[in-house]
């Protein structure tokens, strides 16, 4: 009887212990979010046999790979992409409708903020903040969950690629000032550069004293500043035990893509450099934070189209469709018809912004004129569709396109008419380089790989969307998703 009683006590203790273990909250020491500007998904395999063992191959072979990750909106541009990755939503909700967009009829830069000043140089390159983003992101949610004990830092060559990922409540975001040859920030975050960044700028002065953006050294310096931030801010070594976060965006890949396209020696060079630099970063994380102690993901803010001439040379469809030429043509037409000099104020990101004030000053019905201009645009043989934004939901657009237009439309910040070009047609140089803005897979299909803390190796080909990344990371951290989140957790379900 005593033995049976003892056995019951032991079993009861074991049960209580197991229950306690189930409810123990665990989080990694550090989260690292990496964005590679303009990285197409297929680059993972185009260069696979040329990659070393510790960079992108490590991600592919150790991480969990979402092979069918797409952007689910247009326009597919840098600012919108970075905002979407970290906020778990799209321009319709986060408000970053483009790199530049219109607010109350005035053209604004996505991160422009004249209420703050540059810290680290005498230029205006630091008059930036995340204030135009209308929602929180995963970094903000981490800060909220830990009563702001978590430390969040964002770094990139591009200001928007450092600022938008780091969120509203970041401890710091740092970007490159080409005119001064150093990394800077703004008074939104602090009044003086941290000592580690002053030391970094001084140590790397020779390399920084050039336009690093389109060069392999730009990739190298991005890695260097990421590691400098890791050390300087002691990320992953929070004295409170809370999770820290580092966001790193590699911009040089985008500059090379725009200049040289998706193929060629320069593109090869930049991605092989990226691979080597990722190994350097991963090794630093292993040494400083500990392998298995950090959660890391890699994705892209958009992809990129093959150059039109390259496609034509290989007997495939593609070409150039110039927004500026179409704007000039339509303005001339409607100046004659309605006596309005510039009925189209701007043509950007495949969107038409009409001169509402001029139209209404002529006592014309704005909606009727907008519909008329959309119909005129639709006559262009290089366009598939031209639809007023407010009529997209009831239009004949195929659902795959219609839904992307709706998710990318932000009232008051987007244009009046959305145009959809034929596949492979873009507003760019025919001979060389490329761009991105479209709904097509060449602009929307990007990598998304998780690696590290509590991540098992594997892959899936099921369709997932860019706004699923933030809720996935938040679910893994057991924190609330961002305030405008429209995606779902996709790992561990």
Model-derived regions, located:
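Bacterial Sec-dependent N-terminal signal peptides
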Residues: 1-26
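Beta-strand elements within well-structured catalytic alpha/beta cores of enzymes
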Residues: 28-40, 59, 85, 142, ...
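Short, structured active-site-proximal loop/turn typified by the sulfatase FGly-forming signature C/S-X-P-X-R
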Residues: 44-93, 151-153
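Short, solvent-exposed turn/loop segments enriched in Gly/Ser/Thr/Pro and often Arg
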Residues: 66-86, 154-162, 249, 295, ...
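His/Asp/Glu-rich, glycine-adjacent segments
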Residues: 90, 95-242, 251-258, 378-381, ...
């Amino acid at each position: 009887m005593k033995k049976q009683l003892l056995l019951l006590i032991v079993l009861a203790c074991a049960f209580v212990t197991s229950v306690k273990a189930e409810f123990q909250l665990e989080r990694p020491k550090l989260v690292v979010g990496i964005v590679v500007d303009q990285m197409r998904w297929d680059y993972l395999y185009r260069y696979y046999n040329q990659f070393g063992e510790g960079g992108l191959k490590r991600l592919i072979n150790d991480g969990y790979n979402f092979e069918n990750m797409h952007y689910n909106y247009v326009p597919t541009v840098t600012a919108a992409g970075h905002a979407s990755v970290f906020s778990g939503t799209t321009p319709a909700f986060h408000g970053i409708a483009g790199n530049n967009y219109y607010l109350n009829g005035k053209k604004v830069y996505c991160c422009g903020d004249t209420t703050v000043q540059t810290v680290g140089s005498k230029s205006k390159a630091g008059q930036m903040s995340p204030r135009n983003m209308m929602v929180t992101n995963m970094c903000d949610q981490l800060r909220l969950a830990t009563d702001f004990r978590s430390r969040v830092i964002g770094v990139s060559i591009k200001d928007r690629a450092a600022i938008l990922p780091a969120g509203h409540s970041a401890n710091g975001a740092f970007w490159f000032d080409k005119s001064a040859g150093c990394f800077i920030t703004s008074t939104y975050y602090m009044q003086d550069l941290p000592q580690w960044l002053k030391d970094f700028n001084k140590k790397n002065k020779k390399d920084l004293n050039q336009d690093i953006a389109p060069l392999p050294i730009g990739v190298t310096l991005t890695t260097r500043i990421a590691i400098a931030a890791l050390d300087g801010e002691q990320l992953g070594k929070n004295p409170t035990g809370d999770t820290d976060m580092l966001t790193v965006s590699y911009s040089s890949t985008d500059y090379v893509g725009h200049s040289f396209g998706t193929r060629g020696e320069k593109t090869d060079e930049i991605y092989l450099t990226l691979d080597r630099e990722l190994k350097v970063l991963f090794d630093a994380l292993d040494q400083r934070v500990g392998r298995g102690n950090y959660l890391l993901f890699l994705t892209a803010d958009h992809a990129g189209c093959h150059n039109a001439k390259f496609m034509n040379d290989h007997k495939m469809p593609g070409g150039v469709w110039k927004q500026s030429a179409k704007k000039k043509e339509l303005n001339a037409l409607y100046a004659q018809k309605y006596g309005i000099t510039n009925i189209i104020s701007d043509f950007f990101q495949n969107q038409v912004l009409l001169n509402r004030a001029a139209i209404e000053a002529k006592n014309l019905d704005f909606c009727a004129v907008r519909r008329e201009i959309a119909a005129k645009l639709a006559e262009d043989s290089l366009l598939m569709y031209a639809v007023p934004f407010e009529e997209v939901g009831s239009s004949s657009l195929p659902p795959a396109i219609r839904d992307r237009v709706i998710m990318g439309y932000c009232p008051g910040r987007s244009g009046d008419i959305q145009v959809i070009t034929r596949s492979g047609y873009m507003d760019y140089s025919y001979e060389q380089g490329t761009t991105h803005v479209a709904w097509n897979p060449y602009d929307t299909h990007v990598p998304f790989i998780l690696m590290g803390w509590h991540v098992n190796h594997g892959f899936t080909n099921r369709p997932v969307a860019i706004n699923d990344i933030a809720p996935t990371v938040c679910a893994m951290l057991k924190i609330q998703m961002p305030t405008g989140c429209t995606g779902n957790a996709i790992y561990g379900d």
